[in-house]
């Protein structure tokens, strides 16, 4: 599970806003957070002074006759990660957390975020800002109704509110005599001015054919075929998510951190292809790739990114029907299309199609995971040698694993910010160390590594938790129950077209048996050199049904607040299951190839079926990764792999431990203190 944002996938709100929702932030000490109750207020050095920027913003609000202005923390494409160019909320507030909304009135300013970021907000915001510890539109609107007068106008950038978010604000304000006002010129941008980072300008390039599952022409033809088969026969499909355009044309760039995308829209009609982007970024080779020997309906017209609203409005004047996926379309696009000309589904045909990988895409993703396993194994071997020296901290460790991945063939950087967490930090949501704030790795503590890579042939995401010393009995039990959950879901056979939410509980059952649980989702889709969190695959209530060819992560966990955290994450391919009797059934094929920590496994808790599965998995790891290690003369890592994939044998529970439990339980029943 990568560090999550509101953007790339709406499921992340469920996966992560609830994840560890009751864990306590790191206690940074009273002098590390602001204290606005003193005179003068105490402000740590991490605070940003926002007085001048707020004054300038309010002047802009006056020119628009606004009583309030909403500043979301997203961009125009609901990206999971956003570029510096789009970090408006962070710039105006000083708060850089990946989730949260700011609202400014003529007299007050406030930020709403969830428990993951409360301490961070108190460290970064000055006393111009109130911190509200709720999320969603309802608490924001409740606050607005008390702060702005009747007749007040609430402004927003329509390209920063999704259709659903706009509808929730609009509904909440109905009957209040306050008006929601769409303003296409972003007011924060006007204040930011020349200090605002520029839009990235690196080349947009075509993937080599070896790394694509289909040509872009085949993909376009497939989408047009779906248009013709749709009940409402749309004349066009509008693509707003950056991953959609990148996938459709097999194009990549580096506009977004950790994601190989470029700012773009696509309007694919039954007779034309219009790609909205910065044309100057297309080399002659890329332009030729798009239009070499093309005929009318298969020629790509590149139009300026800024013209998308005007172009869609002009197209909408005709006898047309525009098909959109509402989950990724912003209100700024939606408001330009007459409602009678809209064809809406939750997800666009591109989002649905790319969720199911063809045989070539499957092979590419599997190959990337073999090389990724080499990088992770190299790191684990390096840790075993260096942690006892006391020279490794969370941040330097993250740098090393990123370095090892960068040395792998076809590497294009990490797929998210590495989560490198030791001891109690592993129990914190989205903990990522910094050079200034980190914890030393110790042989006496558990260590959680959640990391992934972008490769030309695939995107990876894997989590392993290890302990180099003597773990407690409870740590071993918790780890083993998490492992059992991973195995139970990975080996499950279920009917085709079953939704992920129907089987998700199998990953929790072993934890539930002991009264344990985890607060986050159990998995997410993953792309081919695209998003590390690829919607709409996964185990949430609003994910689509599982189908052969989908890839998903499987990642149960357990988090002991203030002590340790455990997560075991693998990526798995949905495949046909072999059953005794004929039928349409599916199961998972795990494609992550790094062994689990034997030091943390209590074999006595494993059933014969669990052991059989685990030993088969270890044999697969040997077969897939072993030859690659040998080919590259990584002999120390090969020996490590052999040791850590030795077959596990069944073992009876520790009778002494059970006797101790029995004695303690008996004394407790008798009412004696122990």
Swiss-Prot record:
Annotated membrane topology is: Lipid-anchor; GPI-anchor
- Select a single GO molecular function from the record's annotations and give it: aminopeptidase activity
What reaction(s) does this enzyme catalyze?
A: Release of any N-terminal amino acid, including proline, that is linked to proline, even from a dipeptide or tripeptide
Reading the lineage from the top rank, the first entry is Eukaryota
Give the signal peptide range.
1-21
Its cofactor is: Zn(2+)
What is the annotated localization of this protein?
Cell membrane
Q: Name one GO cellular component term.
A: side of membrane
Which residues does Zn(2+) 2 bind? 461, 524, 555, 569
What disease is associated with this protein? Answer: Angioedema induced by ACE inhibitors: A potentially life-threatening side effect of ACE inhibitors that appears in a subset of patients taking these drugs for hypertension and cardiovascular disease treatment. AEACEI is characterized by swelling of the face, lips, tongue, and airway that can lead to suffocation and death if severe.
What is the protein's given name? Xaa-Pro aminopeptidase 2
